[in-house]
């Protein structure tokens, strides 16, 4: 009986450690672009998800540099700004690895980031070309 109780308590404890609220990681980056711009965008998105879906969300975003310990606490990444992005070679390799393993990168050009973002992503995926998805693509 004591062993069964110990197993149940352990299972409940572990499930609580694993059961985390959905959140989004805002990527910090070098290059002069303002990675911190539009500070209300992610809280608003998380609030919308909480109120309009069955997804339990965290109240705050995570802010992390690529490769930092906080970076690995999530798989939904958000990048925004008004200027140049510059990833180091190490950041390029890490970003490639996480994206190839199922992570999602949400890019939001607040004006002026588009060209730089495309150039940096070409370094992440040099073998890939940008393609426009048709409106009837299954993702929509």
Model feature map: region roles:
Residues 40-44, 48, 90, 94, ...:
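Extracytoplasmic/secreted proteins, especially bacterial periplasmic and envelope-associated proteins
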């Amino acid at each position: 009986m004591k062993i069964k109780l110990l197993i149940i308590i352990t299972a409940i404890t572990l499930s609580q450690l694993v059961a985390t609220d959905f959140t989004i990681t805002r990527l910090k980056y070098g290059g002069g672009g303002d990675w911190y711009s539009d500070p209300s965008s992610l809280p608003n998105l998380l609030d919308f998800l909480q109120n309009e879906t069955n997804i339990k969300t965290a109240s705050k975003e995570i802010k992390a540099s690529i490769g930092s310990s906080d970076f690995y606490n999530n798989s939904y990444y958000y990048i925004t700004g008004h200027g140049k992005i510059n990833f180091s070679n190490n950041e390029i390799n890490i970003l490639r690895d996480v994206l190839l393993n199922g992570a999602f990168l949400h890019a939001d050009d607040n004006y002026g980031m588009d060209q730089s973002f495309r150039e940096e992503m070409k370094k992440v995926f040099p073998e890939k070309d940008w393609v426009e998805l048709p409106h009837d693509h299954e993702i929509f």
